[in-house]
């Protein structure tokens, strides 16, 4: 849908850049753009009262250190107490577990994150360097006039305009959808996750990865002490409904020795002082914006999941949020310098990233040969080979 005709208001505030979405990508971009530009962050939710759905995406590779330093975030990041990433053990290409040592990575092992603390720290840094945050905005009225994007929130009763508009709204891609940009969804992958309370005997810090007949698992102990367990399956899988219950999800996970040894046992779980935590479901499949159409819209950019959303098996979501914020900051500099086609290099980089990602994703999903005949695996192998 094209931008609506903008009604004139006398209380419209002028900015250089408006970022819709105060998640990792939007907040990182705000850090990078200040103090050169006047930056407004608009967030649909009220962050102080946001729904208590634990975020998924708990790791950063060592290569992220360069970006964190560039954004002025690294010292604060280290002080936040994220845990160094240790080994990964996987039952993937074969049922027998195989160990992978992160110390082989020349960029360093990376980190397991306290995701909530990481996001809060990014936003706090953006505000410290002078970005302005307005939260609880709800649906935004969107228009464009005289080369300016114009937005207004009915909840806040305030108008804003800027020559640059950023969609950092995550997988919803709310601003891109309003502008009629197509989004290609590769598959209907769903992530079911549960955050388990601390268990005294669980001191394991490894990332555990298991292929299953109709999907795949991962589990890791977070810096806060809780353990996340996640299962990824098709959205139309008949087992999906039953696995939304913690008892069923845990029972299925315990069928894998690699997971069973770090999960709580049955005795007393969900009884009295040990309540069963909820299971959360969220879309997790690959998706990409129409990058050619994106380049054709002056002053409009997409970052993070709003541009490209990665399958969690790639462990690239948070790194991509930071990397796309850096690339977009450079494009915005080119725009304000008056250069033609400021987005061209950024779009080309996104397209290259997505091409490499799909190639690696195909190789990853081709690993569990023992499951190739099952619909979950056969569907992905066929789609990624095309």
Question: Model-derived features: where do they sit?
Answer:
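Predominantly flavin-linked oxidoreductase catalytic cores and closely associated redox partners
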Residues: 125-268
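Beta1/beta-strand and adjacent pyrophosphate-binding region of the FAD-binding site
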Residues: 9-23, 40
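N-terminal Rossmann-fold NAD(P) dinucleotide-binding loop
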Residues: 26-27
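Short beta-strand to alpha-helix junction loop
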Residues: 103-124, 174, 239-244
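N-terminal FAD cofactor-binding segment of flavoenzymes
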Residues: 51-91
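FAD/FMN-dependent oxidoreductases across multiple families
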Residues: 237-329, 336, 340-344
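C-terminal helical "tail/cap" subdomain of flavin- and related membrane-associated enzymes
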Residues: 330-386
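Glycine-rich FAD pyrophosphate-binding loop
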Residues: 31-56
């Amino acid at each position: 849908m094209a931008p609506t005709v903008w009604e004139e208001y006398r209380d419209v505030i002028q900015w250089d850049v408006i970022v819709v979405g105060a998640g990792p990508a939007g907040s990182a971009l705000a850090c990078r753009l200040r103090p050169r530009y006047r930056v407004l962050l608009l967030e649909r939710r009220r962050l102080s009262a946001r729904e208590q759905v634990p975020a998924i995406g708990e790791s950063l590779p060592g290569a992220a250190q360069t970006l964190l330093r560039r954004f002025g975030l690294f010292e604060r990041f280290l002080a936040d107490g994220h845990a160094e990433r240790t080994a990964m053990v996987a039952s993937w290409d074969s049922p027998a577990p195989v160990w992978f040592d992160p110390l082989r990575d020349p960029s360093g092992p990376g980190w397991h994150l306290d995701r909530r603390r990481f996001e809060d720290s990014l936003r706090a840094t953006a505000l410290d360097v002078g970005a302005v945050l307005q939260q609880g905005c709800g649906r935004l009225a969107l228009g464009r006039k005289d080369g300016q994007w114009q937005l207004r929130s009915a909840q806040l009763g305030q108008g804003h305009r800027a020559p640059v508009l950023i969609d950092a709204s995550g997988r919803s891609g709310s601003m891109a959808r309003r502008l009629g940009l197509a989004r290609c969804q590769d598959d209907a992958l769903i992530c079911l996750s549960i955050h388990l309370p601390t268990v005294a005997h669980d001191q394991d810090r490894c990332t555990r990865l298991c292929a299953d007949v109709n999907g795949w698992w991962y589990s890791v102990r977070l810096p806060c002490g809780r353990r996340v367990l996640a299962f990824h399956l098709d959205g139309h899988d008949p087992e999906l409904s039953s696995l939304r219950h913690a008892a069923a999800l845990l029972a299925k996970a315990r069928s894998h020795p690699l997971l069973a040894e770090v999960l709580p046992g049955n005795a007393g779980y969900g009884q009295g002082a040990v309540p069963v935590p909820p299971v959360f479901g969220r879309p997790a499949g690959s998706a990409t914006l129409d990058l050619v159409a994106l380049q054709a819209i002056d002053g409009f950019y997409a970052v993070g999941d709003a541009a490209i959303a990665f399958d969690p098996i790639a462990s690239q979501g948070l790194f991509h949020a930071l990397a796309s914020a850096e690339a977009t900051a450079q494009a915005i500099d080119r725009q304000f310098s008056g250069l033609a086609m400021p987005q061209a290099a950024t779009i080309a980089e996104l397209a290259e990233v997505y091409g490499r990602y799909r190639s690696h994703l195909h190789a990853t999903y081709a690993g569990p040969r023992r499951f190739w005949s099952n619909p979950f695996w056969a569907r992905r192998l066929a789609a990624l080979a095309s």
